[in-house]
């Protein structure tokens, strides 16, 4: 058997050292990748926090709004004042107030009424949209039939709220309702206009007929013929059966007294 030489032993040792160095380098790379992999969850935690914030924002945006109907608006109160008073209880989206002389609330007797000083702020009813329907429910149940309140000397301090929550009612439905009321108002106006025209035409026909009859009467009176009023009077006159007047004969007593007087003064 041949024994290995010193040079071959050195080469073998050099190869072993190179293998150890490459193995240590591989281990370092593996450890580095492991450290990077362990550092990634920290980033994912930030991403999870960001996603949770986005979810909360989406939840806030996804809140279903609720609408409160105010059946009576105090005189002189404007939509801006309603928004200010209702904004104390929650976030408000839209506010709509209907005027007293609006097409939806047409009053035929309003034409004869005198205009008030603050006619521009004369509203009958209002709709308030809360961004959260739970807030709308609590506000409607809490403020209904309650005094408005406020500082001493406020105009609506002693006035009372009359409101209720409209379940299942959306703001788009309000627009449809207002459009329907306007169409109904226009239809009522058209019917009233046509009725007034027919009454006016009938009146003018009667006036023209009366004029023609008067002209005929005047012509007949000028020609000397019998007027049309005479037969009408005879037709309407009534005849009653009269009894003949019977003279009563003088009594004997009356004759005797006459004879005595004649004898005395005769």
From Swiss-Prot:
Residues 221-231 have a biased composition (Low complexity). GO terms for biological process: endonucleolytic cleavage in 5'-ETS of tricistronic rRNA transcript (SSU-rRNA, 5.8S rRNA, LSU-rRNA); endonucleolytic cleavage in ITS1 to separate SSU-rRNA from 5.8S rRNA and LSU-rRNA from tricistronic rRNA transcript (SSU-rRNA, 5.8S rRNA, LSU-rRNA); endonucleolytic cleavage to generate mature 5'-end of SSU-rRNA from (SSU-rRNA, 5.8S rRNA, LSU-rRNA); small-subunit processome assembly. GO terms for cellular component: nucleolus. Residues 66-160 form the RRM domain. It is found in: Nucleus, Nucleolus. Belongs to the ESF2/ABP1 family. This is Pre-rRNA-processing protein ESF2. It comes from Cryptococcus neoformans var. neoformans serotype D (strain JEC21 / ATCC MYA-565). The gene is ESF2.
